[in-house]
Amino acid sequence: MFKSRFLPVLLVIAALVSGCDAPVLDISEPSHHEKTSARRALDSVSIPPPRRIPASEMQKTIERVEGPIRKAAFEVCRELTLPDVRCQNVLASDLQVMATDQDMNAYADYHNNVGFTGGMIHYSGSDEELAAVYAHELAHVMYGHVDKKINNMLMGMIIGGGIGLAAAYNADPYYDDRITYDLMNTGAAIGSVAYSPEMEIESDRTAIYILEKAGYSPDSMRDVIVRLHRHQDGAIGGHPNGVGFLQTHPSNDRRIAHILSSIDDVKSGVPLRLE
């Protein structure tokens, strides 16, 4: 049983837990029926074959979508009245291509830069699919998702360390200091994935609005997720690489359900709303 003088530490830990960064969009959870329909879409939607773009053409290919998507992402950021520094980060973000990396992946890093692997470009079915991925990653930039994940990781580390100190206080002199170290690492690991699926859904939804503003088909967001799902299962080109773009992401049926709902909203004129 914790001693009463340790109560302030527990209150601090509770405050840190409640302070973890969460998504900011107002997004309803899809129904069971919508998830079932989404599951069917993963297997039945027709998508174009992979273009198998050579490494020498990758930079030029991605640059075709860079300007329109970056401009549209900045406009969406301003319309959402997000902090100006976030919108400026969208304009300042570098776009990098790792042509020799054959995994299908893309990411936004803690410098607010966006990277594409060669596999993502090589296996894409259209420029619009690449535009969808780029819009998704710029949405991460505008929401500051990488910073939020780092903050959540640090909070998790502090919480884990606090639990370890509490145990040490009550177990002394028999406590092993390695337990506190392990708890800090565990807390950091848990914090680093806190809200990750929701942040991905938030970026997917925002990307669809960016695509529409840039003049691309909102359906391309659906198509690229279907392609990634099938590639992950080894259904494209017999090359079953792991798909980093799907790691820490929501389940495919849940993700597609949100995407289909967002596409309907865009086509119906429903605005993007913050909570």
List the predicted regions and their residue ranges.
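Cleavable N-terminal export/targeting peptides
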Residues: 11-14
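Metalloprotease/metallohydrolase-associated module, dominated by Zn2+-dependent proteases
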Residues: 171-220
